[in-house]
Structures are given as structure tokens and as C-alpha cells.
Amino acid sequence: MTLPRQCAAACRTGGGGGGVVRCRAVAAAGGAVAVRDAVVAPVARRGAARKTAETVAGMWREVQGCGDWEGMLEPAPHPVLRGEVARYGELVGACYKAFDLDPASRRYLNCKYGRERMLEEVGMGGAGYEVTRYIYAAADVSVPTMEPSTSGRGRWIGYVAVSTDEMSRRLGRRDVLVSFRGTVTPAEWMANLMSSLEAARLDPCDPRPDVKVESGFLSLYTSADKTCRFGGAGSCREQLLREVSRLVAAYSGGGEDVSVTLAGHSMGSALALLSAYDLAELGLNRAAPVTVFSFGGPRVGNAAFKARCDELGVKALRVTNVHDPITKLPGVFLNEATAGVLRPWRHSCYTHVGVELPLDFFKVGDLASVHDLATYISLLRGADKKQPAAAAADAGGVLAKVMDFVGRRRGGGALPWHDAAMIQMGGLVQTLGLI
């Protein structure tokens, strides 16, 4: 029997009962012995065993990438995997629906709802997760506007949640979820537009100066705003490490199987990957596998960053639209495809991390939504051509508010170069559905 690569003994695809027989395949090479478990069903029970294996609970480790999704993406994504990835996309979409873009609101640029009822308020009360903490991020960049003091202020960037008991039974484990929204504020746009590489230095034992990431993403992840009024004191990194480590310790200490899933769209997928790398450097993935589901995500770091993520066992599934320009950035010219040719600059070449799940938005005839999260989800759900437009309409209110927000930030006494930059950003948002 062929097993997904790198699953090893940790990968379990079925329970111990129901007529399923475990066999142990022992492979020895150069004195090293690797023991792998395979699930073999008796002929008389083959149908029942297959039914068990093709549930989320029966194959959750494969869904989380224990075998690098080998055999699960071609010729078409496995239906269980496709459904799970779409579900995580919807949990990311909740961030957009809950984000407050009303300048008259006291929660302006923060979440509109308290964490106890946020998912219910955005129509996802049955998602099976309980939000345990909100996450805030502040970019350490200056944006000259009428309100320069707000450039580096912390903004609501997403949330941490944990699966309920009922959902955990369906999933086959306790799932700790971190969900990130994409780019909205001017400071975030400026952080996105920064293309220089900077040493991450997130390994507490070794600075690893060769492991570099995009400086804007690193700033969003590590900069702190101690004045944040909604409990976001400390950097995005500090908030996440405290909460995720607390949840993993609480549930794994109780004997449960636990997973850590980080999901994000656009800029949020970059933060998800940075967080996953950080958690793995600190060894948290020894207690719980760490997986990233990225939607329309840009490149984050260089080849050394990718190599270190691979070495640490960080699993990342990149859901991309083959026509989405954001997934080609940064590193339009200096990337994994040109590193071999541009050897003197190979350490400055951006490199994608993980396995790609490509989608083709042209097939739905909706060319204006090349970066739209709703269209990503519709294609994953196997929707027909009429549904992506309807799904995108659900996010239309958010897009309109973003455009209104961008327009207001252009007005007044903004500097000319900033005004031009905001016009370009607004055009990109309107054209590509960047929210």
C-alpha cells in the first residue's frame, strides 16, 4: 500500500474498531528503521472501511497535510479536503463581515461585535467554534495623512477560536484556529508595498540571519501598540503566542488530539505563514501539527525561509487563482523561478512556501474577482457559474465600505504623493476586489 509521503507513524487514517485491521510496514535503509501504519480493511468490510476513511475525522491528518497532500489534489481535490478548505475560507470571511469601517463608530477599524457573539452576528453561529481572543496588529510605518498619529495604531486583524465539543467529534480532534483578514487600512497597504527582505530572527536559540521575510509583514507581526483600547496591547506575535500556547497546553494536556490551523486571505495569509513558522520554531508543533490554509497569498520570505519551514514541518496549502497578480508578489523578477539564473542575488529571491492548489477564475466568467475571497470559496464548493457573483455580492457591502474609506483618506490635506498612492490603491481594490 502506498502511503502519503512523510506521514510516518503520526498519520492515522482510521479508528481502531469497525473491522479495520492495522498493519505495520517496516522499511530499513542504512540502519535507520521507519515504522509506518497503514489501514487495511478486510474484503467483506471494504465499503464500510472506505466510508469511515473518507470522513474528516477519519482522515484529518491528511487534510492537515501530514503527507503534503500527495494524491489529494490531482486530478481534482479530494472532496473532503475541498470541503474543509472552503470551510476555513468562510471562517476567514467572517473577519471581513465583522470589521467596522464606519468612522462614526467607537469601534472604527476594529471588530463590531463582542467575541462571544461575533460568529453568530455574521451568520456563522453554527460554525462549531468559540472565539477565545481577538488579535490586533500595528504596522511600524508612517502614513502622512490628516491623522498622522493613527498610522501605527493597532487594528483588529483577526481572531483565535477553538472547536466546540460537538465539532471536535466531527473533526476527529480539537482544532485551534487562527483567522486573519486581508489588507484594508493605509498603513497595511504601505506594509504590503514594502518589498525589502529582513532577517526574521524569531528562533530564540539561533538568530538565523539567512532566514529572511518581507519587512512589511514582519513589522505587522512584531510591532506593538500599547494604547489599543480593545485589549490588543502587545504585538500580534505576543498575543498569538500566549493564546495558542495556552489552548494547546489545555487540550493536549487533557489527552486530546489537537491541531493548530492558521488561515488567511491576501495579507492575512502572509501573517498566517509567519505565525506558523514562529510556532514551529518554538516547538509548539511537537504537541500539535501546525497547518496554514492560504487564500490568494503573496510570497513571504526567501529560499532559506522556505527551507526552514520545510525542516520544521510547517504545512501550507496555498489556494491560488492562476490569474491573481497578488500571488506573484513580492519578487516579480527575483523569485524561485529565477534564483538559478540570478545566482548572485539568490538569497534575495522570494520563494513560495508549501503546496499549491490552483483555481482558474476564468472558468466562472467573473474576471473582476481575481482576488476575491468569496469567489475562491465558491469554486472550492463546486458552485456553478451563477453562484460566484451571488457570493461576491455578499462581500459587496464590505468592498463598498473599503472604497468609501479609501476615498475619505484621500481627501482633505493629504500630501500629493500620498493622494496619488491612495488613488492607485483604490483602483486596485475596485478592479481586483482586494478587501
From Swiss-Prot:
Gene Ontology MF: a single term: phospholipase activity
Protein name: Phospholipase A1 EG1, chloroplastic/mitochondrial
Gene Ontology CC entries for this record: chloroplast; mitochondrion
Organism name: Oryza sativa subsp. japonica (Rice)
InterPro entries: AB_hydrolase_fold, Fungal_lipase-type
Gene name linked to the record: EG1
KW Kinase (keyword) present: no
Pfam families per the UniProt record, alphabetical: Lipase_3
Lineage, top ranks: Eukaryota, Viridiplantae, Streptophyta, Embryophyta, Tracheophyta
Active site per the UniProt annotation: 266 (acyl-ester intermediate), 324 (charge relay system), 371 (charge relay system)
